[in-house]
Amino acid sequence: MTVLRDMPISFPGLFGAWEFNPDPVALHFGNGIYWYGIILAAAMLCGLLLAMKQAKRVGLTEDHVLDLVLWAVPCCIIGARLYYVIFYLDLYRTADGALDWGQMIAIWDGGIAIYGAVIAGVLVAIVYCRKKKLKLGAMTDVAAMGLMLGQCIGRWGNFMNREAFGAATTLPWRMRLWTSATEYIEVHPTFLYESLWNLVGVLLLVFVITGGRHFDGENTWFYFLWYGLGRTWVEGLRTDSLYLFDWTIMGEPIRVSQALSVAMVLVSAVMLVWHIKVRPHDPSELLVNRLAAENAAAEAEREVVAEELQEAVEPSVGTEKESEVTTDGSTD
């Protein structure tokens, strides 16, 4: 369903007659600078800063994170667009059925999907970690924190665009959007549901999960589990889902994101149980603990060398003093 972007947004069950009417375009010049783009940029920046701040906790440096992001961001944008185009391919055909390549790359007209970005990001991380000889699990663990914060913030771009909303509802927190000058719909604010869900997820990652990790990669699998659970729920409420071609289950079309989310939940749950309960890891295997042990051993070795040098210097000083005394005596 299409809603008007120049009409106000309200939450009548919470705030009565109060309305908010944001212009999707923040700056009107050229093709315009949209709030959606500004919010996505802010989301990426906040996610990057959090990941850099948390890097030391998993045994990495800020430079490791920054280097990866410089490669990942453009690839994630391409992945997000490609994913969307593949599942909405009919939108990018001309009247004679041929593919319209110009429209396919016109990302400024809208049309991206977060799962495409996640898939592209994982592939870039694999290549980067192999090239730099870094532990993939540690890198994706810190990336998971930044990604979830970015998703939490980024969903507010959907609010400014009046998109990614859910089905009709009468709940007190329903969101009112206008479909014409005289008609409106009241729907689930699914952008808000997902934003709050991700906020809880990033708080759990930063303050609970990371400090008690059993293995490198635990944050990553928790991210897939948590986000998958939330997205399975939220996607079931949305009215603008991408569908898996013409496939159905029990007569119902298959939502791409929901199917992928269920698969993510199952796989991540199995991986977490396997690595924590079935085949538990020794804490010393964590990259951060291994580096700490190596640094401690190196420091201990330096102290031993320093002590040996000190012991070698002290007898030499004593011998020199004895020589001076002998020399002085013979002179007298």
Describe these PLM feature segments.
Residues M1-D332:
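A feature for loop-to-transmembrane-helix boundaries and adjacent hydrophobic helices
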